[in-house]
Amino acid sequence: MSNPEEITEVVEVAADEYVSVEEPEVAEDIEAAAAPQAPIVIDRPIQTVGRRKEAVVRVRLTPGSGDFKLNGRTIEDYFPNKVHQQLIKAPLVTVERAESFDIVALLHGGGPSGQAGALRLAIARALIEVTPEDRPALKSAGFLTRDARAVERKKYGLKKARKASQYSKR
């Protein structure tokens, strides 16, 4: 094998073997996956509740075109922060139904962050009632877990929940 001509022949034979391998046809699978899901038909509006911190949100989900009405206002008016808008739409994007449902929500209590988290939970719960087979995807993304974190109460004898006044040894 020390002869350079023999090495060249071996490389050419090996290259021919690898080139002749046929690639699997994946185009059909891509087209099937890219096809939009069939429209959902439900006999009545789905109503769910979501909570986070002090916020409570009641959601009414109906088949539609992806419109949001939050206390009578659009999502852009109610949540001007794009981060909150993405947080709210995340469950719909996860199950690839962002344009399939209209959402009417009544929000009260808490602030923008708590209301956005509560709305996300309520939407995820409503999507499960419509299509139970979406549950594993929503569960693995963490949309069905109620975030139990809340503000810790202030204790007497302390400045805040845990902050004590300065201690002097002498």
Curated annotation (Swiss-Prot):
Keywords: Ribonucleoprotein, Ribosomal protein. It comes from the Bacteria. PROSITE patterns: RIBOSOMAL_S9. One of its GO terms (molecular function) is structural constituent of ribosome. One of its GO terms (biological process) is translation. The keyword Phosphoprotein does not apply. One of its GO terms (cellular component) is small ribosomal subunit. Signal peptide: none annotated. NCBIfam families: PRK00132.1. Belongs to the universal ribosomal protein uS9 family. This is Small ribosomal subunit protein uS9. The lineage of its organism: Bacteria, Bacillati, Actinomycetota, Actinomycetes, Mycobacteriales. The gene is rpsI.
